[in-house]
Amino acid sequence: MTRVFRVAFAGLVFVFALSGCVGPAPTTHTYESKAVRTANDSLSELQTVLLSVQMTRRGRMMQVYLETVLSESEDAFSSIQNTFDSIQPPDTGRADQLRAGLDTLLSDGADGLAQLRILARRQDTRELAAEAHKLTATAAALDKFAQEHG
C-alpha cells in the first residue's frame, strides 16, 4: 500500500509540475500565434473592465460589483501576461520585436487595470472615467496587434 501511495503521489507531482510549464515556441510563426492569442485574451479582459466601468457610471452596475470585476480581471490579466512572458521565443529578430511590442501593451494594460481598481475603491468617478479612457487606447492597440499578426 505504501508503494502504491508513493507512485500515485509521484505521478500527481509530475502532472502538476507539467501543468505549470510553458514550453518554448519552436518557430517564429508559432510564437506569433501565441502572441496573437495573448493579445486577444488580454483584450477581452480590458473590454470587460471598460464595459463594467461604463455600466457603473450609468448607474446600471453597483460599485461593489465593479470592484469585484476589476479585481478578478486584474488577476486574469496578470495570469495571461505571466503565461506569455514564460514562453521562450525562438532566436529571431522578428520574435524579439513581437515580444517587445506585446510586452509594452501588456504592461500598459496591467498598470491601467491596477489604477482603475484603486480609483474604484476610492470611488473617484471622475478620475475613473479618465483612466478608463486611457485604457481604451491600450485596448485598441491590442486589437490592432492581434489584427496585424493574426
Please tell me what each predicted stretch does.
Residues 1-11:
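Bacterial N-terminal signal peptides that target proteins for export
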Residues 21-26:
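Bacterial signal peptide processing site
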Residues 34-41, 45-110, 127, 134-148:
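Alpha-helical segments in soluble extracytoplasmic regions
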Residues 10-15, 124:
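Core hydrophobic alpha-helical membrane-spanning segments
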Residues 116-127:
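Short helix-adjacent coil turns
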Residues 16-20:
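C-terminal motif of bacterial Sec signal peptides marking the signal peptidase cleavage site
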